[in-house]
Amino acid sequence: MVGTGVLRDQPFFQARIAEAVALVRSARTWLHTVVHQAWTSTLTSGTASVAERADLLLAAVHATRSAADAVQLVYTVAGGTANYRHSALQRALRDVHAVTQHIGAAPQQYEEAGRMVLGLDPLQPIVLW
């Protein structure tokens, strides 16, 4: 029941924490995998392939968005105490959403990655490296 007892003892809170952990860990694992692949290719051939660069962009944006979603999940189920300025969740929510405002994590980056996945040239030269 909401509003009674310690949050960590509440099934709804436990479920949201598990969901948040899954979001972050899966996104982080994929990001580490594609970074390793691109790094290995760069060491071997001097450059990462277009497909590897598309994966790098997509994994980086996905990791950022997943982190924001995870914090939002926990913030939402934490209740009213998360709203106070002294709350660590309040700070985490502000920080993670500040990161999502960076051009590298903007939703438009999905368009760039999609172009590259489809074999089209990216519109932003920074993706070319």
How does the language model describe each region?
Residues 33-36, 40, 58, 65, ...:
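Charged/polar, solvent-exposed surface patches and flexible loops
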Residues 17-20, 49, 56, 86-89:
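Hydrophobic packing residues in well-ordered alpha-helices of helical domains and bundles
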Residues 80-129:
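Glycine-rich phosphate/cofactor-binding loops in nucleotide/flavin-utilizing enzymes
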Residues 18-25, 57, 61-68, 94-97, ...:
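Generic structural signal for well-ordered, non-transmembrane alpha-helical segments
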Residues 1-40:
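Extended amphipathic alpha-helical segments enriched in small hydrophobics
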Residues 26-59, 72-83:
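C-terminal helix-coil-helix/basic helical segment that borders enzyme active sites and/or dimer interfaces
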